[in-house]
């Protein structure tokens, strides 16, 4: 299902699964994806994994510059973490379904990859597809000047270089 995804995009989805399981959710949703995107974007995967109880060596992702300003990323993450009730964590080994919203976002990211003729789906494709949604975390990003058009410009720049 994720053959056309970059290593970084797969890491985002892995982080989304860990975040969802940590809060005891029944399925992965937009907040989990947004959390995974921000953690990966800000290059804080090792500390997030430690917070989520994952031990061992982390195989790092390719070097990249953060797309989001650090203060914006921190504020959105804090709001997401505060807005969800916590219940019994779901074991890492348990498969979790994805919400229909998240399924639509993944499909939109794949379509965007084709439309832009990108080699693979990257975290920026996922960000762009996410920006089409009506959601408090997305609105917080818009309020800071992050737009779908801006993300698409960043994808085009990434594809060139």
Please place each PLM-identified region on the residue numbering.
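Histone-fold recognition with a strong bias for associated Lys/Arg-rich disordered tails
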Residues: 1-161
